[in-house]
Amino acid sequence: MAPSGPGSSARRRCRRVLYWIPVVFITLLLGWSYYAYAIQLCIVSMENTGEQVVCLMAYHLLFAMFVWSYWKTIFTLPMNPSKEFHLSYAEKDLLEREPRGEAHQEVLRRAAKDLPIYTRTMSGAIRYCDRCQLIKPDRCHHCSVCDKCILKMDHHCPWVNNCVGFSNYKFFLLFLAYSLLYCLFIAATDLQYFIKFWTNGLPDTQAKFHIMFLFFAAAMFSVSLSSLFGYHCWLVSKNKSTLEAFRSPVFRHGTDKNGFSLGFSKNMRQVFGDEKKYWLLPIFSSLGDGCSFPTCLVNQDPEQASTPAGLNSTAKNLENHQFPAKPLRESQSHLLTDSQSWTESSINPGKCKAGMSNPALTMENET
């Protein structure tokens, strides 16, 4: 356990303040770009009224979407595992008293028995977080900066001072998209005035510095943002997170880098949702609850197709993809309604427990 006291508390407060420096930098840069473009370029330097109106209208639309998506990415709290993944007080007490042997493993085995988890550690053990004292849901990871387990964690982004995960990944993608469009639009409309100032085609004024530096900044950020946005578009198309791209998820049958991929269309809908009218808006519309995800690994993992006794559940082929026969959340089940039927006559849809875990699995702790 981390040391406590006045000194450590002061250090934590200091770190929390320092973590906001990148966000303050982006905010100040955005504020300056507004002044440089809207005032110095459009109002001061542009002489054509029609050009002014068109540029200002398009600019303010992109500016508003940029700020909205950035705000949502920063201030949307990451989702943490629900209470069913936490150990009970009795189980925690047993873990503290028992050595790391068979008795210790049996506690974890019983706790994970009915949870909808299919990923494992590299050694094939249940993924357990000592720090949070919980069994990690699939695609959940512990963030050392936030000191929490984050559902479908992608990465911790210093530019938003927040973890990017299930609750705000769509907002992060839109933030990248609108910031890229914002920079490209500024660079494209500023180019002719940049050339005129560079070749002394316009008189030296206060606007010269702002317009020339604005073009350099917009062009530079366009290059970096285009590569980052392109990379995350590829991740979405494969239904991967940044962490899963660097280290493929491990399932019961072994490692599979495409274990969560359902095909391009369904992968897109996992992040953006079923209603396309919300795709371009920073409004949460992702499918599922962040605790369980459909996979395509039933054929390789017979346990994933198993159900508790008394349940009449089946899993059928959907465009050559197989899904675990477990109850899905209402929004998540939309992925399967086109050509796959689910029989859930005895399943309580309000819970996210299903499936049976292999009692012979070796249990280990993972932080």
UniProtKB/Swiss-Prot annotation:
Keyword field contains Transmembrane helix: yes
Stored Pfam families: DHHC
Database matches in PROSITE patterns: DHHC
Name of the top EC class for this enzyme: transferase
The DHHC domain, residue ranges: 127-177
Lumenal side: 38-54, 192-208
Motif window: NPxY-like endocytic signal: 358-361
GO cellular component assignments: endoplasmic reticulum; endoplasmic reticulum membrane; glutamatergic synapse; Golgi apparatus; Golgi membrane; plasma membrane; postsynaptic density; postsynaptic recycling endosome
EC assignment: 2.3.1.225, 2.3.1.-
Transmembrane segment boundaries: 17-37, 55-75, 171-191, 209-229
Cystines in this chain: none
Ranges where the record places region Disordered: 330-367
Annotated stretches, region: Mediates localization to plasma membrane and recycling endosomes: 299-367
Effect of S306F: In a hepatocellular carcinoma sample; somatic mutation
The protein's name in its UniProt record: Palmitoyltransferase ZDHHC2
Organism for this UniProt entry: Homo sapiens
Gene that this polypeptide is encoded by: ZDHHC2
